[in-house]
């Protein structure tokens, strides 16, 4: 057994003898001391529990350090988790700065269920393009109402504070991913004290959270931290996830905040540490050339092999091909119009017309930023590719509301669907554990596309989050679930509960059992729609 495994086993044994007080379930004993949560009627909550030392001062742009402080008084675990400092896409107005730099916490939600003394655990990584988002933005009322598992929400560093990188050991990047991994270790070591089953941990996430799940799974020892993984509308091969050009952006960040004299990575890092966190994060706006485009200017990178605490040193494709990754059951999904998240802002109206009109003159300029190939090709190759994909999807049509649906399909394919298919293809060829997939088609009355376009008179189809927000409530919905959505919500929640506790990696949705893709000649895809589900085989994703 390696060192990580030994520490986890010993911690779980210690915590098993120091569980919550049966006479006072709100009081929980941890190695740091005691904490007190909140009784919410149908469930208990224990929020804002630190798992790492504050990533401030000398610890900024460093791998996270486990939380070491001891509590002399009972820790107050009733405070809503703060967002990590970010330039938030969904905050209205010119100033989009929200959150705090000291933010590395987990929040735990435990259902009241007299039929169970312990629960499987679902650990959740929120989305937000690695730039924004927060644990509190994903609700838990639906999950707690079903009472099937303990939910743990993970907060992690975002934007430049989480992902700025010069590509060398001085400023390797991926601090947000390292936060997530440390949080997973904390969960494994401590969740038994809350009535969780450390042997039954499922890691899930949506969008950048889903990609994070996949990236965590690429660590060969992932199976010591979780028994299964689920990536909703996001995976490690999406073009906006592991990006090139990070070194140039790191030095550009430095120039934007007064570190233009930095000649190397070490001096740049020292200068960036001397600046205020708000100044660094506010500088994100200098990287946005059009609304919130590109939506992920800072994201995961490939680290050098000599970087301290490196978490990703090889292209994810090569890791999967090697077979040296966490061989646990994995599921991945997409919705039929995921790209609506990225395209919908183009239908926003203004005095001079619709935003999409700008593409007729600026497509060659903007396409590489929308679709994340700005650092992968020469200028000529970028222009040629931009012209080709426009012709492939729109033909001779100009950019306008009539051709918008084809543009949204282009965004869906390039940013989500094609890479989901590629990921599943690699897992079915090189994986040993089950690999599952579903496609969802059931439009919400209001979703993320309507919010970004600020209009409800256009049928965007089933857009990014229309499935996931039936599990975790989100501010973009604002409407009650329809009867069909209530059924789908319960099916999704039961699906996660069963996946977390399954001993053989079986995955079911309602009456439909997912089919394993490993070794299959055709893709085994579960289609989920308004009134049911159906297993389908495809040579290529529909």
UniProtKB/Swiss-Prot annotation:
- Which sites are catalytic? 207, 464
What are the disulphide bonds in this sequence? 84-103, 259-271, 512-533
One GO cellular component term noted in the UniProt record for this chain: extracellular region
Q: Short name of one Pfam family for this protein?
A: COesterase
Q: Where in the cell is it found?
A: Secreted
Entry keyword annotation includes Signal? yes
Keywords of this entry: Disulfide bond, Glycoprotein, Hydrolase, Secreted, Serine esterase, Signal
Q: Say yes or no: keyword Disulfide bond present.
A: yes
Glycosylation sites (chain numbering): 40, 418, 454
CDD domains per the record? Esterase_lipase
**Gene Ontology MF terms in the entry:** carboxylesterase activity; short-chain carboxylesterase activity
PANTHER family for the chain: CARBOXYLIC ESTER HYDROLASE
What family is it from? Belongs to the type-B carboxylesterase/lipase family.
Protein name, as recorded: Esterase 6
Please tell me the species this chain comes from. Answer: Drosophila simulans
Gene for this chain:
Est-6
